[in-house]
Every structure is written in C-alpha cells, then in structure tokens.
Amino acid sequence: MSTGIRHARWDDIPRERVTDDISRRLFTGERMMIAHVYLDKGAIVPTHQHENEQLTYILEGSLRFWIGDPAQGVEELVVNAGEVLYIPSNVPHKAEALEDTFDLDVFSPPRQDWLNGTDSYFHDKK
C-alpha cells in the first residue's frame, strides 16, 4: 500500500545552481513545497509574483524585501535570522541578500516554474 509519504535528508537532495550567487534544494509534496535557498551577499531576487502563498524563514543572514506594486506603493523591510515573512498570493516582491543568507521557503501550491525551469525572472536583475 502506497501512502504517498516520502522522506529525505537535505544533504542528499541535489543543490541546484540558479544564478552565480543563488542556489537551492527542493522537496515537494502534492500541494506544498519546501526549499533551502542559499544567497551570497548582494544576490538579488528580481521583482516577481506568483499564485503561490510563500513563507520565508531566515535561518542565517538577512534579506531586504520590497513588497507591493510600485504603482500603489512599495513596503521595504529587512528580515533577519530567526524571523519569518508571509507573502500572500500574487503580491509583487523583490529581495536582496544583505549578507550571506540561508533561508527556508515554503510554497503552496508548489512552484511549478521552479520545478520545470521556467523561472526566468531570476535572470532579470530589475
């Protein structure tokens, strides 16, 4: 009987290089996904939005976020180690690593663009 339960060690999950200064490991269920994300100091995650709800938990380092639509006003905030951020579905956001950073991102539903390699916004440094 298959229950769909899966188990893995993070160190056994391949680390995918996204850009020169960002890499990640992914673990996915049917309706959620968790990712270890590694950002070098100065790394930029360009402005983007997605249908997925997002939780970002900073394990080490810190990220500066710009959240919201520039036409309606953008909120800037810094999320440090030990802090967590919730980003609702379809809210534009951008991030910059203020130091070498290791974070845990949770998405629901899973980020199909991350799974199928169509996350081209990473290469647009705006």
Predicted regions and their residues:
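Short, conserved beta-strand element in jelly-roll/cupin
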Residues: Y38-D40, H50-F65
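Histidine-centered metal-chelating micro-motifs
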Residues: I44-P46, R64, V84-K94
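A cytosolic small-molecule/anion-sensing beta-strand core signal
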Residues: L59-E60, N80-A81, E99
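Ligand-binding loop in jelly-roll beta-barrel domains
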Residues: S89-D113
